[in-house]
Amino acid sequence: MNLKIKYYLELIRVKNCLTASFGTIIGGLIASNFNFGLIGYILLASLIVFLVCGFGNALNDIQDIEIDKINKPNRPLPSNKISLKSATIFSYLLMISGIIISLFNMICFAIALINSIVLYLYAKKYKRNKIIGNLIVAYLTGSIFIFGGASVGNVEITLILFLCALFATWSREIIKDYEDLDGDKSEGVISLPIKYGKNSIFVAIGFLLCSILLSPLPYILGMFGAPYLMAIMICNVLFILAVLKLLKNPSKEIAGSSSKYIKIIMNLVLLSFVIGSLM
C-alpha cells in the first residue's frame, strides 16, 4: 500500500470509520426488514457515515497535534508523515463529500450536516469537557442507526434503537470517566466523576435504566414479536447484573470491567434488534 494512503487511513482511524459504517448497514437492514432490494441506499448511507466519521477523527488529531507530540509522537501529524495543511484540507474534503452524497435523501442530508457541525464543535470546544462531550459521543453513536433507517425511508424502529444506544453509551462513557478519574484530573478535564465523585455512578446507572425501560417498546408497539422480547430481556438481565455489581462495589477497577461488560451487552442488544426484524 502507498505509504501516504496508509498515513491518511491512520489519520481518520479507519477501523472506527468501518465500525460506524457497519452500524449504519445494520440500522438500514433492520429498518428495511432485510430487504436487500434497498441495499444500494444502505451502502450509500454507510459510505457517508465513513466519510463524516473520518472528518471528525482527522479534526480531532489536528486539534491534538501539540499534545500528541508528547503522548503519541508516531501519529501521522506529530511525526510529520502528513502536513497540518494537507490534513486540514483532507478532513474538510471528507466532510464536503459526505454532505454532497447525502443529498440523495433529505433526512440523511440533515443528519449528515448536523453531525458534521457536532463533530466540529466536539473537536474545537467540548473534547476536554466530558460532561457535554459524553452526550455528544452518545448522540453520534446512536445517530448512525437512524441514518441507516432514514436511507430506506423508515426511522421509526431505528429511533428506539437510537435512544437505547444513546442512554447506554452515555452511561458507559461516565463509567469510563470514573475509571480515568485521576488521569483526567491531572490533564484539567471536566467530567461528572471529577465534580461529583462516586455519585456520578448513580447518574450512569440512571441512564442505563432508561435504556432498559425503552428496550421493550418495539414489542409493545407491535413492531417486533416474541423472539425479540425474549432476546432483549436476556440483555436487560445482563445490564441489571452490571448495575448491581457497580452498586455493590463502585471502585475504579469494577468500573473498568463494567464498562467492557456493558459494551458487550450493547452488541447483544443490536443482535436482538436483528432477531426482531428477521423473526
Swiss-Prot record:
Main subcellular location: membrane
Catalytic activity: sn-3-O-(geranylgeranyl)glycerol 1-phosphate + (2E,6E,10E)-geranylgeranyl diphosphate = 2,3-bis-O-(geranylgeranyl)-sn-glycerol 1-phosphate + diphosphate
Pfam families: UbiA
UniProt subcellular location: Cell membrane
UniProt keyword list: Cell membrane, Lipid biosynthesis, Lipid metabolism, Magnesium, Membrane, Phospholipid biosynthesis, Phospholipid metabolism, Transferase, Transmembrane, Transmembrane helix
Gene Ontology CC annotations of this record: plasma membrane
Domain of life: Archaea
UniProt membrane topology term: Multi-pass membrane protein
Record-annotated membrane-spanning stretches: 14-34, 36-56, 94-114, 131-153, 157-175, 201-221, 224-244, 259-279
Cofactor dependency: Mg(2+)
GO biological process assignments: glycerophospholipid biosynthetic process
Protein EC: 2.5.1.42
Pathway membership: Membrane lipid metabolism; glycerophospholipid metabolism
Heme in keyword set: no
Acetylation is among the record's keywords: no
Disulfide partners: none
GO MF entry, a single one: geranylgeranylglycerol-phosphate geranylgeranyltransferase activity
Similarity section: Belongs to the UbiA prenyltransferase family. DGGGP synthase subfamily.
Stated role: Prenyltransferase that catalyzes the transfer of the geranylgeranyl moiety of geranylgeranyl diphosphate (GGPP) to the C2 hydroxyl of (S)-3-O-geranylgeranylglyceryl phosphate (GGGP). This reaction is the second ether-bond-formation step in the biosynthesis of archaeal membrane lipids.
Protein name: Digeranylgeranylglyceryl phosphate synthase
Phylogenetic lineage: Archaea, Methanobacteriati, Methanobacteriota, Methanomada group, Methanococci
